[in-house]
């Protein structure tokens, strides 16, 4: 069963965005960039160069900034004020809801060509406990499919 599609978008601490007068163009062009290197050879995983160029923006220092080896580390670094990260929506949502992270939604979301699935062996019915977990995960994933976050 498909649970949710994944997407990425720029995310940063509210304080950093305020330092840029709330202007996302300034933020992504001047603040340090946080690079998630967990999928460096995956053509579906967007990087800063691709994200910026699709929006007609440029930076001469694309490789500078923090390089992290896991997508949740990118979210944590952005929350800590280390710079702007391309964060996965599913990992950033909780911090966004709490106000610890702000994300660029309008024209900033890049959908990834992959989804999270819940799998079970074909022809084997789920136990009551497994069904409860499957229902819980499906319900938790629902806001991502309807909100785009």
Language-model region placement:
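Flexible hinge/capping segments at coil-to-helix
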Residues: 1-38
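Structural signal for conserved beta-strand scaffold positions within catalytic alpha/beta enzyme cores
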Residues: 2, 35, 67, 103-105, ...
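Short secondary-structure boundary segments
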Residues: 14, 37, 89-90, 108
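Secondary-structure junction motif
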Residues: 32-55
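Tryptophan-centric aromatic hotspots in well-structured domains and transmembrane helices
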Residues: 45-51, 68, 88, 116, ...
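Hydrophobic hinge/microswitch elements
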Residues: 57-104, 111, 126
